[in-house]
Amino acid sequence: MINKIYGKIVDKKESSIIILAFPFEFEILVSSFCKMELRLLEDVEILTYFHFRDDDVKLFGFLNISEREVFENLIGVDGIGPKAALKILSGIKYDAFRLAIAKEDINLISKVKGIGNKIAGKIFLKLRGKLVKGDESSSYMLKFKELEQSIVNMGFDRKLVVVAFREIMLSDKFLILKEAEQEQFLFTETLKRLSV
């Protein structure tokens, strides 16, 4: 199995990236969120999943272990192969997916293009409890703990800030943002909600 590839991104295609790991070039299928985080000619470390069948050999790439873990759990669901799993992770970011499973939010999963209520229900039944480590929503929000404290220091009630964070983080607008843009969006939207 190929666990990880270090190299330079030399091309970005619709659903893949090309990495030069001298002397080889690898085409790696990635989610749209993963692709948005990567820049051409950037040196990267991509975690991989090597898919091998008699008639199909593909390499799938991920920014971190959590994204790969969600992918591997998804392909364990009957009827969901690697391409479908990647399509799901292109429609909903891996950490939001984990949060949706933890919060039993089947509607968020079923909003992904090509995933209806039936498949979303199947995913939920198979993965319920598998992706949750403690309070998933709390671990998801740890990234924004300093931002939360900053807003509380402005005189807002912590409970209201946390509620606003959770609602905003599950919104479509938040989920399509690059990680670097999420904090600013969360700050602005939280202040809008709390200032009403």
Curated annotation (Swiss-Prot):
Signal sequence, renumbered to the chain: none
Cellular component terms (Gene Ontology): cytoplasm; Holliday junction resolvase complex
InterPro entries: DNA_helicase_Holl-junc_RuvA_I (IPR013849), Hlx-hairpin-Hlx_DNA-bd_motif (IPR003583), NA-bd_OB-fold (IPR012340), RuvA (IPR000085), RuvA_2-like (IPR010994)
Region (Domain III): 143-196
Family matches, as SUPFAM superfamilies: Nucleic acid-binding proteins, RuvA domain 2-like
Region (Flexible linker): 143
Annotated stretches, region: Domain I: 1-63
Disulfide bonds: none
Subcellular location(s) of the protein: Cytoplasm
Function of the molecule: The RuvA-RuvB-RuvC complex processes Holliday junction (HJ) DNA during genetic recombination and DNA repair, while the RuvA-RuvB complex plays an important role in the rescue of blocked DNA replication forks via replication fork reversal (RFR). RuvA specifically binds to HJ cruciform DNA, conferring on it an open structure. The RuvB hexamer acts as an ATP-dependent pump, pulling dsDNA into and through the RuvAB complex. HJ branch migration allows RuvC to scan DNA until it finds its consensus sequence, where it cleaves and resolves the cruciform DNA.
Domain notes: Has three domains with a flexible linker between the domains II and III and assumes an 'L' shape. Domain III is highly mobile and contacts RuvB.
Family statement: Belongs to the RuvA family.
Name recorded for this polypeptide: Holliday junction branch migration complex subunit RuvA
Origin species: Borrelia recurrentis (strain A1)
Gene: ruvA
